[in-house]
C-alpha cells in the first residue's frame, strides 16, 4: 500500500519513532507516531491510520477518519478491533484476557472494506 486516502480529518507534521507502513493503525507515544497494539493496558491505543509508509526520524501524517479497502472475508456491519497480537492491524473479535486494551477501530462496510473512526479504548477486566 502506498498512500491511504482520507475521507475525513488528517493530522500532519508528526515525528515518527518506529517504522510504520501505509494503513497501519498508529498512536502517539512521547509525542511521536508508533504502531498501536492492544496486548496490555499500557500499550499505545490507536488514534488513526498512517497516511503513508514512514521510517524512524520521518515526519508523517495520520488519517483520523479513513476508508480502507484490501481486506477479505469481512462481514458488513461488524466491528474491527485493534489487534492484540500484530501491531498496527485489526482483528474481528474483541481482545480477551484481563488487562488487554479493547478498542473498536472501525466497522466493515463490505467484505473487503473498513471505515475507520477510532473510539476510546477500555481495559478488559
Residues covered by each model-derived region:
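Glycine-anchored, exposed beta-strand/edge motif detector
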Residues: 1-125
